[in-house]
Swiss-Prot record:
This is 3-demethoxyubiquinol 3-hydroxylase. It is found in: Cell membrane. It is a peripheral membrane protein. Its main location: membrane. Belongs to the COQ7 family. It catalyses: a 5-methoxy-2-methyl-3-(all-trans-polyprenyl)benzene-1,4-diol + AH2 + O2 = a 3-demethylubiquinol + A + H2O. Its cofactor is Fe cation.
């Protein structure tokens, strides 16, 4: 990671383009860790449950697309090298989540959201803008975003039946990782966002969840 700070602007543009393709193209994200679902048995699910779980996993997959874009945008504009490296390391960890969710969506007979490119572009812009303001704001945005993700994961875990141990194992590990990302961002000096800002972020997140559940 440390060599990354010596890349030229063209090199960094190419790296960003490569990251976007790996995030958006099917089966292109290669996880560093195996999916937690591998060791879990298949459960008996009704057709209705299968459709609902696929919709929830599609939301989570799009959430990871947004996280990738957010981190990449922030790493592009981060001022301090250590902050840039922290963003890039977090993005690498999110690749695991991205791949795990896609694998599970396919197993459930569905596909990722067709809206992913739109949300990637929007999230990349937000991340880059946050980085331009300050590294402290950028890190604070990470913490607030990951807190929102944890809430969504808790809501989804409450809806997924115990019989679907594969999906539950994925979301449980994701929650552990996301909580750690939030803690790391605050420990690195991230700004604690006030409640009104978090409320606005929550309302925007609902737009994503409502739209990607089915498409």
């Amino acid at each position: 990671m440390s060599a990354d700070r010596h890349y030229s602007p063209i090199d960094r543009f190419l790296l960003q383009a490569d990251s976007a393709l790996r995030t958006l193209l099917p089966f292109s994200g290669q996880p560093a860790r195996p999916s937690p679902a591998i060791v879990e048995p298949d459960g008996e699910l009704s057709e209705e449950d299968t459709r609902h779980i696929a919709g929830l996993m599609r939301i989570n997959h799009t959430g990871e697309v947004c996280a990738q874009a957010l981190y990449q945008g922030q790493s592009l504009t981060a001022r301090l090298p250590e902050v840039r490296e922290a963003m890039e390391e977090a993005a690498e960890e999110e690749i695991d989540h991205l791949a795990w969710c896609e694998q599970r969506i396919r197993q459930l007979g569905s596909r990722p959201s067709v809206l992913n490119p739109i949300f990637y572009g929007l999230s990349f812009g937000v991340g880059a803008a946050a980085g331009l303001v300050s590294d402290r704001v950028s890190l604070g945005f990470v913490a607030a975003t990951e807190d929102q993700v944890c809430k969504h994961l808790d809501e989804h875990l409450a809806q997924i039946p115990q019989e679907d141990r594969k999906s539950r194992a994925i979301l449980e590990q994701m929650r552990v990782d996301e909580e750690q990302h939030s803690s790391n961002a605050l420990a690195a000096g991230g700004l604690r966002f006030p409640a009104p800002v978090k409320l606005g972020m929550s309302l925007l997140a609902k737009v994503m969840t409502k739209s990607t559940y089915r498409i």
